[in-house]
Amino acid sequence: MSGSPTDEPGAGLDDVLVLTFRKSFWASREAERFPHRVYGAIVAGHSTNLLNTVLLAVRAAGAIVRRRPRVLLFGSAHRLVPLALVLRRLRILRARLVVTNQVYFGPRWGRHADRVVVYSRRETEGRPSYLYLPIPADGDFAAVAPHAAERPYAFAGGTTLRDFDTLVAAIEGTGLALVIATDNPSDVPAGEGCEVRGRLPLQEFLALMAGAAVVVVPLRDSEAPHGHTTVAQALCLGKAVVTTRGASVEDYVRDGIEGLLVEPGDVAGYRDAIVRLMADRELRTSCEESARRRAPEFSYETFARSLEALCLELLR
């Protein structure tokens, strides 16, 4: 990117309008680097609820008419993006578009955006408007107090496209303890030494992760990107990670450096990787040190500066 962030946050960004809901990065002080932000109100269920999206669209339309921005930056406003892409294709919307989430559209529509921010390099292949940025990891990592347990344990967390069946099978017979935290605990099979917890407050989730000897992110084989947030959180906590090869997280975990990679669905592979990291203190410490060195890549500050540089480039 030819643009570069300035020392003074927000300088040069008067022609950028952010449209988002107040969540994750967009609820942080780092997001205040962008001086003009339109936040949607969450009045019904999840932020992606249609009513919430309609209300944000109304507020966004008013702000666009008033400010006439040259760049529209879509944050956590996933369902609003397809409408913007249609308006851009019809040449009704003239502002340049930066999108940070592609849940509700694919590459066919993505080409109508000036930049689509994605969280793995694999997603940029053959897509000139797609740009890889490391995902910003959610959590106050400095304030995390690691969970204290009677014996070492492996931790796995998350919900989307998780392969907990393979993980639980891998732990069987090892005598190792495993703690799983997921929004859908009923989907996790019962297993020896396995403790399952439901949805947790973020800092409690991170405390369990921080207290683990090893973090495991078992992912299903899928073209859809997934698992980045949990992996980035583990790296920010300086944890050695076992995760799935080819599941779009290889930009985060390099085999033998930040952790170990296993083929999708490979029970024996997961068992060997987990047992190896738990038993080999030297390897585990080396992976933890590498993780800590990578942590700044996933900070809110780094993400904010990268988005700023991107917007400044489009404003040139």
Residue map of PLM features:
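C-terminal alpha-helical cap of glycosyltransferases
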Residues: 300-316
